[in-house]
Swiss-Prot record:
Residues 319-395 are annotated as: Disordered. The lineage of its organism: Eukaryota, Metazoa, Chordata, Craniata, Vertebrata. The chain crosses the membrane at residues 149-169. This is Microfibrillar-associated protein 3-like. Disulfide bonds join C68-C125. Pfam families: I-set (PF07679). May participate in the nuclear signaling of EGFR and MAPK1/ERK2. The modification Phosphoserine is found at S298, S303, S306, S307. InterPro entries: Ig-like_dom (IPR007110), Ig-like_dom_sf (IPR036179), Ig-like_fold (IPR013783), Ig_I-set (IPR013098), Ig_sub (IPR003599), Ig_sub2 (IPR003598). Its main location: membrane. Residues 325-340 have a biased composition (Basic and acidic residues). GO terms for cellular component: cell junction; cytoplasm; nucleoplasm; nucleus; plasma membrane.
């Protein structure tokens, strides 16, 4: 009995490990099946863009390589389109010859050989598989490097520069010639015609004063000086602007100056006022200024006040009536005419000044401007001829009366 029990205990243990091994194998199989099923889901994916390129710049005549930069599983199928939407294909005969202009490489690469300026534009890559489709666009820019155009532009610039330089040199030469001619003409004008006109103006300026007193002589000198200064200014102005038409302008200006200076004024008549208590005869009511006291009759005249825009001068004329004694009357008849000294000296004005003059019956003062005068008809009887060559103060002698004119500015 004891031997049989020991044998049974030995035979039972081998069955337990077998069961454990079978169960382990079954578990491993199930785990393997589940793992394989999960792997099948992970391996499939839609296409994605892994890098984007905006544009590519290449020189004309070189090659351009454009990458689609797309990834997906299973493998993607790539197609390229140009800017007008045309599908780019590589012909079979071109493949046999080593490839044409458009070469489709693995991984979605497009190789453009011998790029021309007309190849510029946008290129679109379309990548697709069983899970989806995606596209990527790249712009191709071509640099134009033709040597003929560069030479053409250079030649055009050189020709334009040469023309401009020739025109500038010609203009400078013409200006220089005009300057010389203008200077010569101006010098000739002021040596001949201009000098004569200026000399006439100076002579007329010396005869500007119509009365002889210290103040009038000073006014004449000032006016003469201003006339000379104005003439010099005109000459300097003519020399400062070197243009040929200036010669005519200068002559016109000088002629206008002479015309302004040569304004002729009609005779000025003054009415004598009879002193109180005396009655003057009708024939002596009006006195006329002698021709010697009038302004010059020169065609160039004797005043430049209008050209200098000076204020009008006030002239006060004093008329004194003195009765003449019989003795003086006899002397006057024997002598014939009065002798009048030169008015440029100050002695006559001192002799007939109001301070040293004898008291007269009445003195009437009339103020007249050099521009506004009231002409009065002259009587039939004028002054003696001897007074036509005299200057202020003017002396008029009647039968029994001596009238002295004194003028002051």
């Amino acid at each position: 009995m004891g031997l049989q029990k020991s044998h049974l205990t030995v035979c039972l243990p081998p069955s337990v490990p077998f069961l454990i091994l079978v169960s382990t194998l079954a578990t491993a199989k199930s785990v393997t099946n589940s793992t394989l099923n999960g792997t099948d889901v992970v391996l499939g994916s839609v296409p994605v863009i892994i890098a984007r390129t905006d544009h590519i710049i290449v020189k004309e005549g070189s090659s351009a390589l454009i990458n689609c930069s797309a990834y997906g599983f299973p493998d993607l199928e790539f197609k390229w389109y140009n800017s007008v939407g045309k599908l780019l294909k590589e012909m079979d005969d071109e493949k046999e010859k080593g490839g044409g202009k458009w070469q489709m490489l693995d991984g979605g690469l497009l190789n453009i050989t011998k790029v021309s300026f007309s190849d510029r534009g946008k290129y679109t890559c379309v990548a697709s598989n069983i899970y989806g489709t995606i596209n990527n666009t790249v712009t191709l820019r071509v640099i134009f490097t033709s040597g003929d155009m560069g030479v053409y532009y250079m030649v055009v610039c050189l020709v334009a520069f040469t023309i401009v330089m020739i025109l500038n040199i010609t203009r400078l030469c013409m200006m220089s010639s005009h300057l010389k001619k203008t200077e010569k003409a101006i010098n000739e004008f002021f040596r001949t015609e201009g000098a004569e006109k200026l000399q006439k103006a100076f002579e007329i300026a010396k005869r500007i004063p119509i009365i002889t007193s210290a103040k009038t002589l000073e006014l004449a000198k000032v006016t003469q000086f201003k006339t000379m200064e104005f003439a010099r200014y005109i000459e300097e102005l003519a020399r400062s602007v070197p243009l040929p038409p200036l010669i005519m302008n200068c002559r016109t200006i000088m002629e206008e100056i002479m015309e302004v200076v040569g304004l002729e004024e009609q005779g000025q008549n003054f009415v004598r006022h009879t002193p109180e208590g005396q009655e003057a005869p009708d024939r002596d009511e009006v006195y006329t200024i002698p021709n010697s006291l009038k302004r010059s009759e020169s065609p160039t005249a004797d005043s430049d006040a209008s050209s200098l825009h000076e204020q009008p001068q006030q002239i006060a004329i004093k008329v004194s009536v003195h009765p003449q004694s019989k003795r003086d009357h006899v002397d006057d008849q024997e002598g014939g005419h009065f002798e009048v000294k030169d008015e440029e000296e100050t002695e006559p004005s001192e002799e007939h000044s109001p301070e040293t003059a004898e008291p007269s019956t009445d003195i009437t003062t009339t103020e007249l401007t050099s521009e506004e005068t009231s002409p009065v008809e002259a009587p039939e009887r004028g002054l003696p001829p001897a007074h036509l060559e005299t200057t202020e103060p003017a002396v008029t002698c009647d039968r029994n009366t001596c009238i002295i004119y004194e003028s002051h500015v």
